[in-house]
Amino acid sequence: MIEPLLCGIVLGLVPITLLGLFVSAWNQYRRGSGLLDMD
């Protein structure tokens, strides 16, 4: 039985962590490729 608090913390942190990784990867991709210069 998983504690509701722990389950809530995990469900709250996982999307934020994935979003942070995606944003950092997207920023490196945009910075690395100067060909696609879109605003």
From Swiss-Prot:
InterPro entries named among the record's database cross-references: Cyt_6/f_cplx_su5, Cyt_6/f_cplx_su5_sf
The record's subcellular location field reads: Cellular thylakoid membrane
- Topology with respect to the bilayer: Single-pass membrane protein
Instruction: Determine the domain of life of the protein's source.
Output: Bacteria
Which GO biological process entries does UniProt record here? cytochrome complex assembly; photosynthesis
Mind telling me which GO cellular component terms the entry cites? cytochrome b6f complex; plasma membrane-derived thylakoid membrane
What are the UniProt keywords, alphabetically?
A: Electron transport, Membrane, Photosynthesis, Thylakoid, Transmembrane, Transmembrane helix, Transport
| Assembly and oligomerization | The 4 large subunits of the cytochrome b6-f complex are cytochrome b6, subunit IV (17 kDa polypeptide, PetD), cytochrome f and the Rieske protein, while the 4 small subunits are PetG, PetL, PetM and PetN. The complex functions as a dimer.
Query: What is the recorded name of this protein?
Result: Cytochrome b6-f complex subunit 5
User: What organism is this sequence from?
Assistant: Prochlorococcus marinus (strain MIT 9515)
